Design a protein with these regions (language model features):
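ATP-binding N-terminal substructure of ATP-dependent carboxylate-amine bond-forming enzymes
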Residues: 1-93, 410
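ATP-dependent carboxylate/phosphate-activation module, predominantly the ATP-grasp catalytic core
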Residues: 169-228, 239, 251-277
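Acidic di-acidic motifs
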Residues: 4, 312-314, 387-391
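Alpha-helical substrate-recognition element adjacent to the catalytic core
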Residues: 284-373
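A short glycine-rich, hydrophobically flanked beta-strand micro-motif that places a catalytic Asp/Glu
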Residues: 230-242
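Active-site nucleotide/adenylate-binding loops and adjacent lid/helix of ATP-dependent enzymes
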Residues: 99-174, 185-188, 214
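Conserved Lys-Pro-Asp/Glu-containing loop-to-beta segment of HAD-superfamily phosphomonoesterases
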Residues: 375-393, 398
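Non-catalytic pre-domain segments flanking phosphatase-related domains
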Residues: 246, 254-311
């Protein structure tokens, strides 16, 4: 997958990383990107797609790691890889080159669909603008980059002086929708699901929910009949001042908020992989009510090396009668990595009974049940250990006497990380 650190790349990762049929690799040209915190198999140091050596560098990675398919995760990359498919050592997952070329240009998209769908009015010059505000948009681009809503001619002239290639188009004030689609290798539109874009941040939809309506299915069929798609794609429409749905853009790739339909059972990235393998697929979507709200997610990387974890029970692993599921996730990560778990507690009741009620009785390699007044620090025997406790006093005592890292429950999130090797260039 390339570039693996984009929002699109991260959605592809979430779509494919748990499938047992797929070994997933992420690659990037940018040293600082979120992909390096996520991918178990991560490769950096690729040239940019504009570099003459990009294809050779990509082919080296493909051959070195036995890559079968390349999944593009950005519009510009999508077009570049489609243009260079014959020179690449593996197959690119995506639609044919001509479709990619049309979809990567708003002007070309509008020219193709103007005879059959409503598209935004384009103004060849500012003299032809009938009313303000208008939109200025790059011909190519995604996620709202370089888009300006301009209320006056003076402001429009300011932006056009900086970038004469911007398209001047009508402002559409209504609701906005994305329709997530999948077309199989036979050209059949197998799924089209609409979702309303309820909140936009930096051009990305961060709050969305599914919507029904035959009009969205009709639009999807019309677009699918005009362009040749293969695999995942989507299009966006927005209501005009009269409520008319107007085609904004089409993209033959994964969208970040496709996670909404993925959680209803439609995994667009996985469907596209199987379709690229010339496999027939079946789609079974759930119909319960759902909405998605996205926010920045933190991932951490530390230099900690440990073979033992000591953890407190009361108000730490179990709080107010409820299991701390975030902490349990970390403890099971330790189990997967062969780290030994020690429960260290002054619990006043039967520890076995409490763990049994919480269904945690077989989780720990050792249970140390201290009496009142006994110091937890004296029970910790290893130097390659961590200590987790809600009590600052307990953490301070352990840190000062044992010199090991100590964590409050809220800080355990920094310990949740992919067990990945060092990045390979």
């Amino acid at each position: 997958m390339f570039p693996c650190g984009s929002e699109v790349g991260l959605e592809i990762y979430r779509s494919l990383s748990t499938d047992t049929h797929i070994e997933l690799y992420g690659a990037s040209s940018v040293a600082s990107n979120h992909g390096r915190f996520v991918f178990r198999n991560y490769v950096d140091g690729l040239p940019y797609i504009t570099d003459p050596g990009f294809i050779d560098a990509m082919n080296s990675i493909i051959r070195d790691h036995g890559i079968d398919f390349l999944f593009p995760a950005m519009d510009g990359v999508l077009l570049n890889l489609a243009e260079n498919q014959e020179q690449l050592a593996c197959r690119v997952i995506g639609s044919p080159l001509e479709t990619c070329r049309i979809c990567c240009s708003k002007r070309a998209t509008y020219e193709v669909f103007a005879p059959i769908l409503r598209v935004p009015l384009l103004y060849p010059s500012l003299d032809e603008v009938p009313a303000w505000p208008i939109f200025l948009k790059p011909d190519s681009g995604y996620g709202g980059h370089g888009v300006h809503k301009v209320p006056s001619r003076d402001e429009a002239e300011f932006f056009l002086k900086r970038d004469k290639s911007l398209l001047a188009m009508e402002y559409l004030p209504g609701r906005e929708y994305t329709i997530d689609c999948f077309t199989d290798r036979h050209g059949h539109l197998r799924f089209a699901g609409a979702r309303e874009r309820l909140r936009i941040k930096d051009g990305l939809c961060v709050h969305s929910r599914p919507v029904g309506g035959a009009i969205f299915q009709e639009l999807a069929r019309t677009i699918n009949a005009r362009l040749q798609f293969r695999g995942v794609w989507f299009f966006q429409v927005k209501e005009s001042s009269r409520g008319e749905l107007t085609l904004m853009e089409i993209a033959p790739r994964v969208a970040g908020t496709m996670a909404l339909h993925r959680n209803l059972g439609v995994n667009f990235a996985l469907l596209s992989v199987f379709d690229a393998m010339d496999m027939d697929v079946h789609i079974q979507a759930n119909d319960f009510q759902i909405e998605i709200d996205r926010a920045v997610t933190s991932r951490f990387r530390t230099d900690l090396h440990y073979r033992h974890v000591y953890v407190d029970l009361d108000d730490c692993l179990i709080c107010d009668g409820f299991v701390n599921t975030s902490l349990v996730a970390f403890l099971y990560q330790c189990v997967n990595r062969g780290v030994l778990l020690h429960l260290l507690t002054r619990h006043r009741r039967s520890v076995d009974e409490t763990l049994g009620q919480a269904r945690l009785q077989n989780l720990f390699d050792e249970v140390i049940h201290l009496q009142a007044g006994e110091a937890k620090s004296q029970a910790i025997r290893q130097a390659d250990a961590l200590f987790i406790d809600d009590s600052f006093q307990e953490r301070r005592d352990v840190h000062e006497s044992k010199g090991i890292p100590v964590f409050a429950p809220d800080a355990v999130e920094c310990l949740m990380q992919s067990d990945q090797p060092e990045a390979r260039s």
